[in-house]
């Protein structure tokens, strides 16, 4: 693989374990959601996102219904922007009081630092909100890695399974799509990125994917088990 001009990476299942998100972050936000909404529901930023939830369900409803809806969305792993924003706010409190640190695979932390030192700009694209992404990298168990990242993208730029989202990112960072390497564990995301001309690599970590995906499903994407196998 030739050296890309920029690297765009996913988080869950790519730099970090799926189990940390599913077993630590999601349950934490679910438990904290009722108290957080009742305590901060009148804050303009929080109310903005709660109003988006109300608009989504199409009703003028009390906060208790919004809380139940948000908890259901967490259980369903909905990629709704308002949910992700509220989760990020809750996780921010958790990081500040050191209830947890964000999991980061050692190979990812080392390679991100090496690429940054080599002058390759790094970007993050995750379904989690941009503030949540920044907190994740700032409070990782490998230390504060947020300074390695040049810019951050979430679902405000579009769905991760739509090619148009990757075109927007390429335009935003000012690098031709063909010179961007996108890293993800989700084949449908890689398919969307490849339709724009981006280079792609599928992360298939044994911790997250004990059964390898079939060659037919992987298609033309490069398949690696960790970041150290990405050589250019």
Curated annotation (Swiss-Prot):
Pathway: Amino-acid biosynthesis; L-methionine biosynthesis via salvage pathway; L-methionine from S-methyl-5-thio-alpha-D-ribose 1-phosphate: step 3/6; Amino-acid biosynthesis; L-methionine biosynthesis via salvage pathway; L-methionine from S-methyl-5-thio-alpha-D-ribose 1-phosphate: step 4/6. GO terms for biological process: L-methionine salvage from methylthioadenosine. It holds the Pfam family Hydrolase. Its EC number is 3.1.3.77. It catalyses: 5-methylsulfanyl-2,3-dioxopentyl phosphate + H2O = 1,2-dihydroxy-5-(methylsulfanyl)pent-1-en-3-one + phosphate. Signal peptide: none annotated. Bifunctional enzyme that catalyzes the enolization of 2,3-diketo-5-methylthiopentyl-1-phosphate (DK-MTP-1-P) into the intermediate 2-hydroxy-3-keto-5-methylthiopentenyl-1-phosphate (HK-MTPenyl-1-P), which is then dephosphorylated to form the acireductone 1,2-dihydroxy-3-keto-5-methylthiopentene (DHK-MTPene). Belongs to the HAD-like hydrolase superfamily. MasA/MtnC family. This is Enolase-phosphatase E1. The lineage of its organism: Bacteria, Pseudomonadati, Pseudomonadota, Gammaproteobacteria, Lysobacterales. The gene is mtnC.
